[in-house]
Amino acid sequence: MNDVDNPVSLSDLSTSRFAEIQEGDLRLKLHYNDCGSGAETVVMLHGSGPGASGWANFNRNVEPLVAAGYRVVLMDCPGWSKSDPIVCSGSRSELNASALKGLLDAIGLDKVHIIGNSMGGHSAVAFALANPSRVGKLILMGGGTGGPSQFVPMPTEGIKLLQGLYREPTIENLKKMMAVFVFDSSSLTEELYQARLDNMMSRRDHLENFVKSLAINPKQFTDYGPRLGEVTAPALVIWGRDDRFVPMDAGLRLIWGMPNAELHIFNRCGHWAQWEHADKFNRMVLGFLKQSEGSL
């Protein structure tokens, strides 16, 4: 019996895989989770927080997609979780896009839908610009392009706390960051804090390399504003009204620029829409993917 027959069996451990990739000068061992066996594949790309991973970011969203008949691949970006460490001196968005291309080539996937949260959204747009024929649909939450906000001074409150946590990875700093990460921090449990802290501290090399990367290049995420018109894939842009990491005007920039994009804004929602409003998010994503089915 495979995972698509028995979604309850899905877990981080049961779906854990590794792939060696070579994409140009980039040679890396990447970790990913591979769930289900549908004809269409949805790739999920996580954000840049300390201790982040594909599974930690999207564990509330995998089972509904698999149950609906999709194969789901969650890539741990270079420098996170069980993937190889790296110091990034250029565009982190483009590094992750190259890594994704290498992973898709390694596991024999051509065209995919991509869901990207925060950094994952930036990376999804970078991938779509470099590989337009390999993208079905895009779902972007709290990310898609770097660049300044017209709403709030940069860096934002959340990004300052995130960078502080990388430099001083303590449970106190983690709680400070998570308190502004979501709209309602009362939903965060001590178990969640501890799991995230354990993930962070298990890979001190990733934390140190992120700080080194920022010192070399403080602008890790490319501003794709001038090129958004080239992203013609159907795109669903999702934002939290109360996002204190990436302000809502970034979502407006995306739909102004991308010709086939639509925007949904969740009230009472921070930077983690797929977790904070998981049920509504899952229904919305499935509805969007099933419009004009067979686009792959």
UniProtKB/Swiss-Prot annotation:
One of its GO terms (cellular component) is cytoplasm. Keywords: Aromatic hydrocarbons catabolism, Hydrolase. The keyword Hydrolase applies. InterPro entries: AB_hydrolase_1, AB_hydrolase_fold, Epox_hydrolase-like, MhpC_alpha/beta_hydrolase. The record marks 118 as: Transition state stabilizer. Residues 41-277 form the AB hydrolase-1 domain. Pathway: Aromatic compound metabolism; 3-phenylpropanoate degradation. The keyword Nucleotide-binding does not apply. GO terms for biological process: 3-phenylpropionate catabolic process. GO terms for molecular function: 2-hydroxy-6-oxonona-2,4,7-trienedioate hydrolase activity; 2-hydroxy-6-oxonona-2,4-dienedioate hydrolase activity; protein homodimerization activity. It holds the Pfam family Abhydrolase_1. The active site is at 271 (proton acceptor). Transmembrane segments: none annotated. Catalyzes the cleavage of the C5-C6 bond of 2-hydroxy-6-oxononadienedioate and 2-hydroxy-6-oxononatrienedioate, a dienol ring fission product of the bacterial meta-cleavage pathway for degradation of phenylpropionic acid. Homodimer. This is 2-hydroxy-6-oxononadienedioate/2-hydroxy-6-oxononatrienedioate hydrolase 2. The lineage of its organism: Bacteria, Pseudomonadati, Pseudomonadota, Betaproteobacteria, Rhodocyclales. The gene is mhpC2.
